[in-house]
Amino acid sequence: MSGLGIMVLTLLLLVFMETSHQDAGEKQAMQRDAINVRRRRSITRRVSEACEESCEEEEKHCCHENNGVYTCLRYCWG
């Protein structure tokens, strides 16, 4: 094989190795971003201002409101 052929094959091998390395880095970044999105997701509760004020006096959060009865807790689950 001529010297030019060996140089071309070497160049192709180097390009292939570099693009494979970049693809792996992009895949890791996408996985990391997906994990961060899952962690940021939260539940937004919609309750009346009266419920918020009532629970605020007890230094708690209004988690649920049903027919004027307020459920005030330190942490709202689910």
UniProtKB/Swiss-Prot annotation:
Proregion span(s): 20-44
Signal peptide range in chain numbering: 1-19
Name under which the protein is recorded: Conotoxin ArMSGL-011
Tissue specificity: Expressed by the venom duct.
Predominant localisation class: secreted
Subcellular location: Secreted
GO molecular function, one term: toxin activity
Family to which this protein belongs: Belongs to the conotoxin O3 superfamily.
Residues with the Tryptophan amide modification: W77
Source species of the chain: Conus arenatus (Sand-dusted cone)
InterPro entries to which the protein is assigned, alphabetical: Conotoxin
Free-text note on domains in this protein's UniProt record: The presence of a 'disulfide through disulfide knot' structurally defines this protein as a knottin.
Keywords: Amidation, Cleavage on pair of basic residues, Disulfide bond, Knottin, Neurotoxin, Secreted, Signal, Toxin
Cellular component GO terms, alphabetical: extracellular region
Cysteine pairings via disulfide bonds: C51-C63, C55-C72, C62-C76
